[in-house]
Amino acid sequence: MPLTAYFQPARAAARGTVVWLHGFLGDHREWQTVAAACVEHNHLFIDLPGHGGSAHLCAVDFAHVNEQLIATLNSYNILEYWLVGYSLGGRIAMFHATQGNTPGLRGLVVEGGHPGLLNADERDARFVADKQWAQRFHDEPIETVLDAWYRQPVFATLTDAQRQELITLRACNAPTALATMLEATSPGRQPPLYEPLARLSVPFHYLCGERDAKFRALAATLNVPLHLITGAGHNAHRENPAAVACCLNAILRP
């Protein structure tokens, strides 16, 4: 079944379509500030399962999400596209790009997305941790869980005001739907993608906030063009949208 999505035509002669995938807790609006500065492309903003207009849809694993993504592209007759994804959306984008059934894919841009844990014990431990987070979404007020979520080390660069803004923004999500998606797409259930990513025949660019030490280190292991976003942490497109838009325009123009 297709996911809920929102199509926006280019404001100039279209060079193609960009498909935007948000992170966990986000929705189709997450990329719109950046996309507004990319005037030469059509845009398709997707709500992933358990989020936004797709909150009523669930997924069981990465392959299922990929099927839903392909169905969405087909429903909008998207024949050629660049795929841009942040965090969870980046992991889904990388999975999609490496499955072989992507004749229309013209390029891949990932911001702060993990290519996959190589060690089985690490994957098992991460899945256990994500199941615990999922249970918290079931059991506790969503504001309490979000406050704890945004205090994880990867979000250490957030100020108190930025953290509270995100909590307020994300509190409208459906906790049960989030819990289901969190378990289905945990890095603990994600296959390592390093080898298939290295064999991609389309351009692959990685964006990362310069203050995001963890994902800067991960990006260095991919051997792909790395674009550091000034003054930003893990959520670079939110913290410095102008720089991300400038970077994307340079990548997307042939």
From Swiss-Prot:
InterPro entries: AB_hydrolase_1, AB_hydrolase_fold, SHCHC_synthase_MenH. Pathway: Quinol/quinone metabolism; 1,4-dihydroxy-2-naphthoate biosynthesis; 1,4-dihydroxy-2-naphthoate from chorismate: step 3/7; Quinol/quinone metabolism; menaquinone biosynthesis. GO terms for biological process: menaquinone biosynthetic process. GO terms for molecular function: 2-succinyl-6-hydroxy-2,4-cyclohexadiene-1-carboxylate synthase activity. It is an enzyme of class 4 (lyase). Pfam families: Abhydrolase_6. SUPFAM superfamilies: alpha/beta-Hydrolases. It catalyses: 5-enolpyruvoyl-6-hydroxy-2-succinyl-cyclohex-3-ene-1-carboxylate = (1R,6R)-6-hydroxy-2-succinyl-cyclohexa-2,4-diene-1-carboxylate + pyruvate. Its EC number is 4.2.99.20. Disulfide bonds: none annotated. Monomer. HAMAP family: MenH. Belongs to the AB hydrolase superfamily. MenH family. Catalyzes a proton abstraction reaction that results in 2,5-elimination of pyruvate from 2-succinyl-5-enolpyruvyl-6-hydroxy-3-cyclohexene-1-carboxylate (SEPHCHC) and the formation of 2-succinyl-6-hydroxy-2,4-cyclohexadiene-1-carboxylate (SHCHC). This is 2-succinyl-6-hydroxy-2,4-cyclohexadiene-1-carboxylate synthase. It comes from Cronobacter sakazakii (strain ATCC BAA-894). The lineage of its organism: Bacteria, Pseudomonadati, Pseudomonadota, Gammaproteobacteria, Enterobacterales.
